């Protein structure tokens, strides 16, 4: 963290942190406790500033639940299948697990992250790798299955008692309707 380095090197005595507090409302508490790896990373995209500047609701590219961080336990525990291991799939799996559900996350490729793995390649975009790393770290207790394409047969057999969340879509594909 830049603030950490500035204070450690005697450049300043304190730093004001703005956008990262929107990205992770527990930023200060986690930093104070030394839990730096648990902080949801801000990528400095400025999306939050758009809402502030134009009097609109604040939103965050990295934290879809900004200003709504409390996750209540589900009144009824369910089995949940999340199809797709991109950012939406990882967030859906995290929230479902946090609510107390039994969660399986299936990703057809050999790694999680989806299009974020490509988005972090251009010069100046390496911060995005921190988002993927953070999101992966939040999947403790989730049954993550890589190299797994969910088929109709799997849904009819192994996952017949599951609620299904489909989070695919960055690569257009024809999907056969399920009846």
Which residues are covered by each model-predicted region?
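Phosphate-coordination loops involved in phosphoryl transfer and adenosine-cofactor binding
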Residues: 76-80, 147, 161
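Glycine-/small-residue-rich beta->alpha transition segments that form the dinucleotide
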Residues: 162-163, 167-174
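Beta1-alpha1 glycine-rich phosphate/pyrophosphate-binding loop at the start
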Residues: 81-146, 179
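General beta-strand structural signal in soluble alpha/beta enzymes
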Residues: 17, 146, 166-167
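Short low-complexity, flexible loop/linker segments enriched in glycine and/or proline
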Residues: 6-9, 29-32, 118-122, 126, ...
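A conserved short coil-to-beta-strand element within the FAD-binding core of flavoproteins
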Residues: 146-158
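C-terminal structured "cap/appendage" subdomains that terminate the fold
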Residues: 4-14, 26, 126, 136, ...
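Flavin-dependent oxidoreductase catalytic cores
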Residues: 1-83, 87-103, 111, 171-179
């Amino acid at each position: 963290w830049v603030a950490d380095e500035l204070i450690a090197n005697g450049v300043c005595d304190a730093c004001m942190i703005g956008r990262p507090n929107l990205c992770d409302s527990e930023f200060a508490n986690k930093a104070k406790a030394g839990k730096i790896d648990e902080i949801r990373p801000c990528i400095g995209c400025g999306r939050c500033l758009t809402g502030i500047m134009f009097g609109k609701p604040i939103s965050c590219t990295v934290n879809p639940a900004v200003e709504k961080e409390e996750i209540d336990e589900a009144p009824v525990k369910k089995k949940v299948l999340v199809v797709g291991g991109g950012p939406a799939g990882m967030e859906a799996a995290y929230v479902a697990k946090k609510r107390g559900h039994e969660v399986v996350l299936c990703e057809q490729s050999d790694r999680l992250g989806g299009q974020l793995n490509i988005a972090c390649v251009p010069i100046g975009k390496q911060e995005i790798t921190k988002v993927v790393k953070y999101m992966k770290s939040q999947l403790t207790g989730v049954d993550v299955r890589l190299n797994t394409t969910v088929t109709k047969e799997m849904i009819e057999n192994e996952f017949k008692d599951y609620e299904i969340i489909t989070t695919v879509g960055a690569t257009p594909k024809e999907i056969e309707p399920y009846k």
